[in-house]
Amino acid sequence: MTRALRNIAIIAHVDHGKTTLVDQLLRQSGTFRENQQMVERVMDSNDIEKERGITILAKNCAVEYEGTHINIVDTPGHADFGGEVERVLSMVDSVLLLVDAVEGPMPQTRFVTKKALALGLKPIVVVNKIDRPGARIDWVINQTFDLFDKLGATDEQLDFPIVYASGLNGYASLTPEARDGDMRPLFEAVLEHVPVRPADPDAPLQLQITSLDFSTYVGRIGVGRITRGRIKPGQPVVMRFGPDGEVLSRKINQVLSFTGLERVQVESAEAGDIVLINGIEDVGIGATICAVDTPEALPMITVDEPTLTMNFLVNSSPLAGREGKFVTSRQIRDRLMKELNHNVALRVRDTGDETVFEVSGRGELHLTILVENMRREGYELAVSRPRVVLQEVDGVKHEPFELLTVDVEDEHQGGVMEELGRRKGEMLDMASDGRGRTRLEYKISARGLIGFQSEFLTLTRGTGLMSHIFDSYAPVKDGSVFERRNGVLISQDDGAAVAYALWKLQDRGRMFVKPGDALYEGMIIGIHSRDNDLVVNPIKGKQLTNVRASGTDEAVRLVPPIQMSLEYAVEFIDDDELVEVTPQSIRLRKRFLKEHERRRASRETE
């Protein structure tokens, strides 16, 4: 008897409540014991995901509901992790599209939804947070319908079932008025509307690996859905990368399946199930595991190419090695190679210089999260400004363009449009919701977006929503898309910052440092109020004499320094600057620390 199975993926924009909803599904299906300690937001398993509330790695969990095993796969909402999305969707038969009852569908959901509709998956729409003040449910459903229509959905896909829910309060309903209850209507909708893909458990084994995991105990772990046949621990199999790949003989060590959030060893698994296997050291994404006598491989999975490149350098500042455990080029190289094991959309290239690595990824977030992870693990390194990856088509250089959607209050619309015009953005659509907010859609080059996030938050006083998604490659736009308007303040000496000196420098610009911070020659300590760089002395104390002052001393009043996040730092720097990243600090510096070296370098580039 084949077991009752359903495989679904959840699509949601950042912060629309996907992970909270999954918590409720796990709780109410009885997957957690009554006395078990529940962690909030179960699916976001690493620290960065919990802090920022974004999902980076596609994760799986499973619930049992009335005898049916439901595999739930989380998809990353961010286009930067598009490499993950496409593979995940190949494992499921339907998608739950989760939209916020106030914000409606956002561009990051658009990316995943487009991929899902193209694969012919039927969506179930879940309107979440229906108890929020300001919920506009009809508008949200109309927006969702229009989005599906724009993305080329079939009539069958446009006839989608709708479930109204509040993940936080743990209820779902088929009517928007409900304010209590449980998740049963959502489970019922899944059982009713998710198709069961026909699969033959008695045919020869075929299993395609769609994502990888790594464990220090058993090595590489492959995750995938069994297309047909059965698999058990200790079984001899063959592995092929695509129909033309070499036939490699291998042996399965363990087979694991998902139950709740746990991975449980099973004696055998059959067609339709999503499983983890280990014991094959060289398993890779897209590999097909087949029965020994019928080595029929499935076509390889394609992953989007990287659009941004950054250089990772060994930290060479005077303060290098004081805070980090891993500082050498070999240690950084080993860590990057380890990352390639499961981060499929990443590329690492050696340059001629052994202290510099060229790392390419799907976007700024993709790369800065890698840097943030390394920093937390005790690495020290320096990173350069991101550059876009150009492609040559018929002798013409093409650069990546993105679709940008911003949602702003009407009063900030002018400033945002002016800034996007300066960055050579092309407006595609503009719609007001009649409640004082306007949604703008632009097509803009990835170069033009570098550094836009922090500028945008300033322009909208933190009230704007923005997100962007890779669209296509197109011929390079002429001229520089964006130059930083201000110069920087550069320290001329090594030492600790002195309050009196910083106070005297306040008229010259905003500071990044506070009194007592360790500084060195060539380090950037603030933003200059004009457009040129200025070398200053922030470690000079007040000259004291033995003549008594007739009045009182002037009181030193300092403006608080700008708090720098890694994203802000990476967006802020220019081509001749680097971000120094250590476990405790983020500092900005010039590539050449000495003034005469900088002058020589700028003469050579002219």
What is the role of each PLM region?
Residues 101, 127-129, 167-168, 280, ...:
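A short beta-strand-to-loop transition that corresponds to the Sensor-1 phosphate-sensing loop
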Residues 15, 21, 53, 72-74, ...:
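Residue-level signature of catalytic and energy-coupling elements of molecular machines
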Residues 202, 207, 214-219:
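A contiguous, basic/glycine-rich beta-loop/short-helix subdomain that forms a polymer-engagement track
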Residues 1-99, 103, 143, 212-215:
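P-loop NTPase switch module centered on the Walker A-proximal segment
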Residues 85-99, 104-148:
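Conserved P-loop NTPase nucleotide-binding/switch module
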Residues 159-161, 188-192, 196, 222-606:
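Accessory interaction regions appended to the cores of large information-processing enzymes
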Residues 122, 132-192:
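Canonical P-loop GTPase G-domain recognition
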